[in-house]
Curated annotation (Swiss-Prot):
SUPFAM superfamilies per record: Nucleotidylyl transferase, Ribokinase-like
The name this protein goes by in its record: Bifunctional protein HldE
Entry EC no(s): 2.7.1.167, 2.7.7.70
Functional description taken from the UniProt entry: Catalyzes the ADP transfer from ATP to D-glycero-beta-D-manno-heptose 1-phosphate, yielding ADP-D-glycero-beta-D-manno-heptose.
Gene that specifies this protein: hldE
Residues at which ATP binds: 194-197
Coiled-coil positions: none
Catalysed reaction equations from the record: D-glycero-beta-D-manno-heptose 7-phosphate + ATP = D-glycero-beta-D-manno-heptose 1,7-bisphosphate + ADP + H(+); D-glycero-beta-D-manno-heptose 1-phosphate + ATP + H(+) = ADP-D-glycero-beta-D-manno-heptose + diphosphate
Record PROSITE patterns: PFKB_KINASES_1
Region (Ribokinase) location: 1-318
Keywords: ATP-binding, Carbohydrate metabolism, Kinase, Multifunctional enzyme, Nucleotide-binding, Nucleotidyltransferase, Transferase
Quaternary structure, from the entry: Homodimer.
């Protein structure tokens, strides 16, 4: 299944559900309390993040999709914090504020990236389902997907009215379910329970075959369009009537914190479907997104560049011949891992042993090596008629096959100065016997604090000499 980045900017999504504030107290621990055998945390940072349905909306907006949110809060500073954070993220939020009842707050005490304690401040909201439904119906115009983010806190009480209102407008409804009665989601386009939520409804599943059988039965009983069971380290399983089960393995490189992973799944699904992706592709994108977000601390969102880089890794474009856009994203990812970027350039018309040795030496100057080559017209201007011997596509393909080379890109000018201004490598490398100040682009790299190095060339290795020798014979 080939993946590509959807046009999220054309994918408006409406989220309705239980909003909450995830509050974090960060601090150091160096002693045990004399009052009880518990650690003493000296708080030095307080952080607020949107949680629940608000985190779903935040994730959708972070992908670049227009996001609207309807929910219930108290009339307090926690609601104000939520509203401010969502506004800053570009989410349009409409809160039904209830007097004399607090906004739901999940307070986590953190030390050294570990959660020591969670304290919940909440009372289920006894909202009037008609009032919330009226807010939603007025917002459905122009929306491409409706998400029901249900945490069982009271904001969603008339699920069927919302589902039917969306279906009448042919708007897909995605629901992240809670509780032991999934019949309230009857008629939804897709529900996304995790494995424990799913087994609470259908009973324990001994293997995948039983999971599929019970899932298909649930689909038919509830008239669901599809069922996606998220299974932690075992990945995800997508079930649809009339289609084979689709099992996707987990994509996480490192699991650091699973808080909010379900929110990331449904938000990526919603944005992708709203952008016109079919369901299997949307699920594959959601699986990639979940693999990224579990590597972050606490409730977190995945950004469009992060998802784009994950797609590139999935499609094998993490190395090799890249476009400028792909290269800049790959560089961002490498720098996020504190990797040093090395850049060299040339025509590389006929690759020989001298080139290979030089590129290995260049690669040793850092962690990632970019090789930029002159395109065919540029080589012809530099070397004269009859050059290049090999086309730019062939030259790039050969270079990309070398173990020392990470990324290959071409440029049309005589020199790579324009490319250097955009790439901004940490190290510019050139082969030859001239001074550093004579290296083309040295002034550009040195101006932003980069390093320029000149490496010696292997003797008796020259493309021009090889070409002349061939012509004489």
């Amino acid at each position: 299944m080939k993946l590509s980045m959807p046009r999220f900017d054309q994918a408006p999504v409406l989220v309705v559900g239980d909003v909450m504030l995830d509050r974090y107290w960060h601090g150091g621990t160096s002693r045990i309390s004399p009052e009880a055998p518990v650690p003493v945390v000296k708080v030095d940072q307080i952080e607020d993040r949107p949680g629940g349905a608000a985190n779903v909306a935040l994730n959708i907006a972070a992908l670049g999709a227009p996001a609207s949110l309807v929910g219930v809060t108290g009339q307090d500073e926690a609601a104000d914090s939520l509203a401010n954070s969502l506004q800053a993220a570009g989410v349009r939020s409409i809160f039904q504020r209830i007097a004399h009842q607090p906004t739901i707050v999940k307070l986590r005490v953190m030390s050294r990236h570990q959660q020591l304690l969670r304290i919940d401040f909440e009372e289920p909201f006894a909202t009037d389902p008609l009032s919330l439904g009226e807010e939603v119906e007025g917002l459905l115009e122009g929306v491409k997907v409706l998400v029901l983010s249900d945490y069982g806190k009271g904001a969603l009480r008339n699920h069927q009215a919302l589902i039917q209102a969306a279906r009448q407008k042919q708007i897909p409804v995605l629901a992240d379910p809670k509780g032991k009665d999934f019949s309230i989601y009857r008629g939804a386009s897709l529900i996304t329970p995790n494995l424990s939520e799913f087994e609470a409804i259908v009973g324990r599943c001994a293997d995948e075959a039983e999971l599929v059988a019970k899932g298909l039965k649930l689909l038919e009983e509830l008239d669901l369009g599809a069922l996606l069971v998220t299974r932690g380290e075992h990945g995800m399983t997508l079930l649809r009537v009339g289609h084979p089960a689709l099992h996707l393995p987990a994509r996480a490189r490192e699991v650091f914190d699973v808080t909010g992973a379900g929110d990331t799944v449904i938000s990526t699904l919603a944005a992708a479907i709203a952008a016109g992706e079919d369901l299997p592709h949307a699920v594959a994108l959601a699986n990639l997104a979940a693999g990224i977000v579990v590597g972050k601390l606490g409730t977190a969102a995945i950004s469009a560049p992060e998802l784009r880089r994950a797609i590139q890794r999935e499609e094998g474009s993490e190395r090799g011949v890249l476009s400028l856009e792909q290269l800049l994203l790959a560089i961002d990812d490498a720098r996020a891992h504190n990797e040093t970027i090395v850049f060299t350039n040339g025509c590389f018309d006929i690759l020989h042993a001298g080139h290979v040795t030089y590129l290995e030496q260049a690669r040793a100057q850092g962690d990632r090596l970019i090789v930029a080559i002159n395109d065919d017209a540029s080589v012809s201007r530099l070397k004269g008629p009859g050059r290049p011997i090999n086309s730019v596509d062939r030259r790039m393909a050969v270079l990309a096959g070398l173990g020392a080379v990470d990324w290959v890109i071409s440029f049309p000018e005589a020199t790579p100065e324009n490319l250097l201004r955009q790439v901004k490598p940490d190290v510019l490398v050139k082969g030859g016997d001239y001074g550093i100040d004579q290296v083309v682009g040295a002034d550009i790299v040195k101006a932003y604090g980069g390093t320029v190095k000149v490496l010696g060339l292997v003797e008796n290795s020259s493309t021009t000499a090889i070409v002349e020798k061939i012509r004489k014979h």
